[in-house]
Amino acid sequence: MPVRRYGGRYNNSSSGVSNALSSSSTAGLRPSPSSRENSTPLSTHHDPAFLSTNHAKNEGGLCQKHHVRFREPSVEVEVEIMDDEPSRGLQKPPSRARHAADANNNSASAQCNTTRTSDYTFYTNEDQKKVYEALRSLRPLPELQEPRRVKEYSEVSIKESLYRIVEAHDVIMVAGAFFGDEGKGKTVDAVAHHPLCTCIARVNSGENAGHTVYDKAGRKFVFNLAPSGLLLPGKRNYIGPECVMDPVSFMEKEIIQLISAGIDYHDRLFIGNVCIVTPYHKLLDLLGSAANSSTLKGMAPVHGSKVMKRGIRLDHIFNDDETLRKRLEKDMETYLGLLKVKNLSDADVVRLCREENSDGVLRVPDYVIAFAQAKEKVKFLMNLYHDRVRNNPDFPARCDVIYELRAAVLRGEKVLLEGPQSYWLSNARTKFWESTTSADTTAAGLLAASQLNFQQFKSVVLNVHKAPGSSRVGIGACPSSFVPQDFFSAQNIKTLHDLPPATCANFEAIQRTLFRDGFPYSNDKAKHNGIMAPVEYSDETGDYNIGVAMAIASAQHHGECGAVTKKPRVCGFFDCVLQHEVNSIQGPYLTISALDRGDEYDKVGVTIAYVYYNPEGKQVNVNGHVYKNGDIIRAGDPVPSESALYHCHPIVKLIDGWRDNPIAAAKRRRNTPLPRGLCELLSTIEYFTNCKVLSIGNGPNGDDIIYLRQ
């Protein structure tokens, strides 16, 4: 099992911690180091191929099985757990003495060797130490000393920077440059405020995207499909026909916010002929348990219906009932067939839905459960859509979105395409294909979905990244993450509230330990090779591998969790290897959000390369190139697929922080010189990715942006 810089154990005597972590539901998740002879230490994530051929040992030797689904905001993982009593919650991580004792429990464990499980630990295990010993002698790359010259950056006004770009183009796209959650909303808002930008559109993806926006009164709105410009008077907002929509959820979760706030949206929101996400698509998401059946929003199933030309679009709801009925009957065959294959009754499905909602989070809406209960399911759906959509006076106006966008550009207006998710979460990117969303969320995908003539209209992409604390959610490889992507899920940490309050709460001490002890030769150019040492951090709750401590502390301190789900995101270093490809495809402009976080760091880490290392010596063939131990993948080299990235480790360049010269909007006066550490960070990112940093975020407010002279 691939494992990397993570681990830690809670002290048994810690006040309140034992009770908080007393559930035995994850007892099979952390076998002893001696039982992981075939594991791959220090790799970032589960390798699916490995999961299918290796088995974990149950700590207690107990063989009663139950299934627990762990879902991240973008993907789902199903882990089969062996346990004596099914329950929810966290398991107290075993002590090292317990690990040693478990090595003698092989006979009982052998009876349960079909279990798929993760072998993650909270503390630093021996496997991780061995891999570090293999990598610590890696010769320092010359690139660690680059760039030789630190560029000086100066602040300019929005009119001198962003608005010049907007005015020179017809179509402006704001796109995620990493794995989503980069803070795109602030840039969207800045572009939308330009007087020539009259149209803001969401043109693909669906309810699985999300963003939080505020109006002038400071009221908070959480949207999924609704464009961010919806709160701006005089702007027209569109949801294009390549989007997928659950119209019932859209009305209940998004439009209701506008109605409650007294905002008249009828002259500023228009919906195209979107594909409809039905209740059975969401139930297929629940029952399928596939790697990309993500948030119970029905994304993969509805895109399947769309590609197969089954299902329904919004126009079907407003037209002939007989056609609507026949199409629903035909498309529902997939759902009914799955029930038959799995030997599930309607009552079984209802029970599973209620189990998903049992912790108080409404993951499966009431109308979806009502559909599962209904005897005449097609009739139920037709009545649902008649009442909630066709005959609902609050449902937004419909139009030909493609025509309206094209007409606006021809009139000399600017169109803003608001990108959901990101480049690397796009289903069109083969490198992370198995762990992506179901739409093409690259800038090219946005432009294609808008159907705006790229030969006739000038377009530009504003890429958005985030640092420090670049993050990804869901399974998949991400070499620069502090822990594997499914680490929190594997520990049954569904929200940050599942952690005892004092767990890794001292962010200041943890980041200091990381940069002081995790990179012991950071001040010696001849010895610093950028490989992070698996050191430990200790607090009143226990001992933690520094990667785990940083992952927990970053999620808590920076608020890196879902706006609604509160599921923690996995943070890590800014990744120049991945960013270089993004820039080469849809660059050069880059805006970096949340850089005021750097005010609290002794140093800031940037991944400038990877080193491939598999402890078993296995090679991986990707696109005809064979990756073997010791191979270096630099920024600008071809990015391999996840089969290789699972075994890649970041080579980190360290840059001095700027504690003495904070850039946070609340502490900095505009137009004051930018600190050298920040300038070195920006110079490093530009050097290794060939991008142009257009602006940086320095606070929570919409106008907390520092625009840079280009």
Curated annotation (Swiss-Prot):
Its cofactor is Mg(2+). It comes from Leishmania braziliensis. This is Adenylosuccinate synthetase. One of its GO terms (biological process) is 'de novo' AMP biosynthetic process. Plays an important role in the salvage pathway for purine nucleotide biosynthesis. Catalyzes the first committed step in the biosynthesis of AMP from IMP. Belongs to the adenylosuccinate synthetase family. Substrate binds at residues 563-569. Mg(2+) binds at residues 181, 210. The lineage of its organism: Eukaryota, Discoba, Euglenozoa, Kinetoplastea, Metakinetoplastina. GTP binds at residues 180-186, 210-212, 569, 697-699. It is an enzyme of class 6 (ligase).
